[in-house]
């Protein structure tokens, strides 16, 4: 079924793993400024004799095919079948070869990469092609090296699949599974907040993915709705590991400039450089409430001070009594006055109050003092999830929640895409939405 990504070097001839793909599209995975520490694994000279990447005619070195135990996900079979019928595909085409993939359309562009919707000529399945331009002097960006290195070792139903790597003289292309959408786009199509049942399923999958990577000693460091991909069934997968880092237990010194500002925890905003898995838990808590409310918790700010003020309005200003060591952090300001008192989360975000145990879980994730935050594994067994089938806790890492009988999304309360599907006779295609 697949191939293993070479853990030592990205170069023509390396072994890149491939697994059957599923799901649909997502927006561009962006890089953000980070530290410039040495690469996780050795990288050879960026240049090669192969031709440069062209989205419609890829030429690159071949890769050795190896087996994989990762099961197939669920892609949009209706759209995929139409593409299969219109494009040639051959099982004899090699993995790692540029000619094995065809570009269909551009999905987005980031600071160092462009993402295309594509199709594999090997098996006719949809893929997302993340094309990274290599600077003649600097070679491959460290974020790309880091992402490939980490994804190689992460094998889980709630982690995006890296099928293949295509290396040419001018570009490095990651071939990912093609997901239907991302959580940000999904919420924009269903404004006003998501169905509470669907929030529970999405949140369980998010925490399941986080519990897995944290157990593997990896921090994501850039959780936001745009980096959570969704299949047409509702499978949620963590994506964009460009800022992710292998971590030490319990903490390590890193850059404080991590996580998009709206989802950045107060300890990182205050300049803390020693953190562990609680960094991701704060972001997950923000996303949890955002799914209920339909809008970000702390939006519209342009600098760290304003972001902190918005957080203090809800949690209250921390003191040495409530947060030991807070006054020693670089961005701590002893003149914050008047000190707001903590508020109940359901008073600030009213939809939490309509779902039993939701506020309690959210409050355990959004603690100012990092060590007080619940872990992902602890959150998974919170009473908020007690209504879900017990079989979900016995699933192998590679198994989707939706393999359990009766687990499915419910129709959203507001669906802006319903009229489009009706006009195009697609009402029965995505039944889950």
Curated annotation (Swiss-Prot):
UniProt keyword list: ATP-binding, Kinase, Magnesium, Metal-binding, Nucleotide-binding, Serine/threonine-protein kinase, Transferase
Residues forming the catalytic site: 173 (proton acceptor)
Catalytic activity: L-seryl-[protein] + ATP = O-phospho-L-seryl-[protein] + ADP + H(+); L-threonyl-[protein] + ATP = O-phospho-L-threonyl-[protein] + ADP + H(+)
MF-aspect GO terms: ATP binding; cyclin-dependent protein serine/threonine kinase activity; metal ion binding; protein serine kinase activity; protein serine/threonine kinase activity
Protein's name in the database: Cyclin-dependent kinase 15
Region of interest: Disordered: 46-83
Residues bound to ATP: 58-66, 81
Homology family: Belongs to the protein kinase superfamily. CMGC Ser/Thr protein kinase family. CDC2/CDKX subfamily.
Organism name: Mus musculus (Mouse)
Function recorded in the entry: Serine/threonine-protein kinase that acts like an antiapoptotic protein that counters TRAIL/TNFSF10-induced apoptosis by inducing phosphorylation of BIRC5 at 'Thr-34'.
Cofactor(s) this protein cannot do without: Mg(2+)
Protein kinase domain segment(s): 52-336
Class of the enzyme per the UniProt entry, highest EC level: transferase
Lineage: superkingdom: Eukaryota
Signal peptide: none
EC number: 2.7.11.22
């Amino acid at each position: 079924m697949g191939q293993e990504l070479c853990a030592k070097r990205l170069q023509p001839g390396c072994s890149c793993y491939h697994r059957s793909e599923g799901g649909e599209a997502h927006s561009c995975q962006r890089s953000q400024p980070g530290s410039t520490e040495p690469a996780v694994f050795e990288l050879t000279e960026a240049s090669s004799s192969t031709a440069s990447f062209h989205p419609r005619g890829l030429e690159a070195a071949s890769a050795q095919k190896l087996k994989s135990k990762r099961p197939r996900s669920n892609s949009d079979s209706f759209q995929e079948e139409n593409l299969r019928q219109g494009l040639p595909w051959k099982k004899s085409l090699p993995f790692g070869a540029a000619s094995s993939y065809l570009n269909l359309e551009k999905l987005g562009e980031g600071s160092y990469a462009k993402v295309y919707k594509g199709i594999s000529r090997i098996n006719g399945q949809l893929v997302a092609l993340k094309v990274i331009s290599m600077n003649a002097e600097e070679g491959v960006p460290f974020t790309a090296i880091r992402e490939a290195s980490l994804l190689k070792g992460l094998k889980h139903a709630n982690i995006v699949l890296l099928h293949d790597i295509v290396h040419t003289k001018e570009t490095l292309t990651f071939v990912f599974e093609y997901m239907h959408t991302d959580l940000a786009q999904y919420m924009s199509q269903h404004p006003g907040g998501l169905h509470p049942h669907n929030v529970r399923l999405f949140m369980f999958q998010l925490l399941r993915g986080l519990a897995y990577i944290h157990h593997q000693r990896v921090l994501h460091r850039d959780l936001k709705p745009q980096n959570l991909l969704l299949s047409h069934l509702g499978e949620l997968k963590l994506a964009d590991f460009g800022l992710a880092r292998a971590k030490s237990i319990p903490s390590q010194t890193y850059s404080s400039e991590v996580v998009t500002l709206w989802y950045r925890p107060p300890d990182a905003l205050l300049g803390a450089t020693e953190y562990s898995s609680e960094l991701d838990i704060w972001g997950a808590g923000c996303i949890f409430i955002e799914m209920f409310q339909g809008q970000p918790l702390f939006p519209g700010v342009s600098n760290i001070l304003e972001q902190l003020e918005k957080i203090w309005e809800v949690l209250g200003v921390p003191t040495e009594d409530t947060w030991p060591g807070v006054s020693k952090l670089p961005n701590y300001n002893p003149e914050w006055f008047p000190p707001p008192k903590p508020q109940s989360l359901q008073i600030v975000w009213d939809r939490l109050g309509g779902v039993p145990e939701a506020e309690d879980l959210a409050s355990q994730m959004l603690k100012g003092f990092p060590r007080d935050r619940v872990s992902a594994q602890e959150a998974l067994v919170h009473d908020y999830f007690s209504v879900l089938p017990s079989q979900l806790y016995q699933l192998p890492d590679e198994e989707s929640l939706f393999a359990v009988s009766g687990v499915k999304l419910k129709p959203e309360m507001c669906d802006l895409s319903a009229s489009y599907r009706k006009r195009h006779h697609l009402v029965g295609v995505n039944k889950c939405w």
